[in-house]
Amino acid sequence: MSDMHSLLIAAILGVVEGLTEFLPVSSTGHMIIVGHLLGFEGDTAKTFEVVIQLGSILAVVVMFWRRLFGLIGIHFGRPLQREGESKGRLTLIHILLGMIPAVVLGLVFHDTIKSLFNPINVMYALVVGGLLLIAAECLKPKEPRAPGLDDMTYRQAFMIGCFQCLALWPGFSRSGATISGGMLMGVSRYAASEFSFLLAVPMMMGATVLDLYKSWSFLTAADIPMFAVGFVTAFVVALIAIKTFLQLIKRISFIPFAIYRFVVAAAVYVVFF
């Protein structure tokens, strides 16, 4: 593979990762399809995907750095208030409660989960995840009990964490599972999305660093330019995608995302079967 060809592949996959990682459309499904079409598969490809995920995570840190510092008691300027005055405040406990279910389940069933990484399981997950998005839009309370992040209860955070367990099924979409769960628990669409992004930082950082440690041997000095291009591209695109997504969901529901998931599932079927 020539240098220019590998850098082009890195840029394409960086765009795909950045666009889809935090949208409820399954980055796994997209990466499987695009990686297959580009002929970029195998151990090096898996390590590359881990590295560019770090770029996407960094975008969330940059977007929500004030809120993240606030979770550990460090505040800059006036206290954050999203939608009117709130009696409470989002704390580190909310994040920990949102993490516990998936962390426990992920550790217990780690090997089983890894065995699910194949096109057929991803295809089914895309469909089921799309149905959950539709269910969340149809069944959510008319008036959210938690219009803003600081209105969320510990129970809501824990229940969102339980929904996050669905994302252990490859192709389901972590953001799709957590946002849908939040809406069903009475959290507004916007606040549920913000909480999903905040929850992604420790969850994805931990999983990504662990995967990177295990696959470090597949990274060579010759791969560094390619990995750097993918990392930076994923970071920039994810930053734009998150900002756009948060503005978009103020005006539209998640139904279009659900329909898109069904289209991607059909694409997986066509490409692999």
UniProtKB/Swiss-Prot annotation:
HAMAP family tied to this protein: Undec_diphosphatase
E.C. number: 3.6.1.27
Name of encoding gene: uppP
Note: Bacitracin is thought to be involved in the inhibition of peptidoglycan synthesis by sequestering undecaprenyl diphosphate, thereby reducing the pool of lipid carrier available.
Cystine pairings recorded for this chain: none
Function as written in the Swiss-Prot or TrEMBL entry: Catalyzes the dephosphorylation of undecaprenyl diphosphate (UPP). Confers resistance to bacitracin.
Predominant localisation class: membrane
Transmembrane segments: 6-26, 45-65, 90-110, 116-136, 190-210, 222-242, 252-272
Stored InterPro entries: UppP (IPR003824)
This protein's UniProt keywords: Antibiotic resistance, Cell inner membrane, Cell membrane, Cell shape, Cell wall biogenesis/degradation, Hydrolase, Membrane, Peptidoglycan synthesis, Transmembrane, Transmembrane helix
Name of the molecule in the record: Undecaprenyl-diphosphatase
Record bears the keyword Transmembrane helix: yes
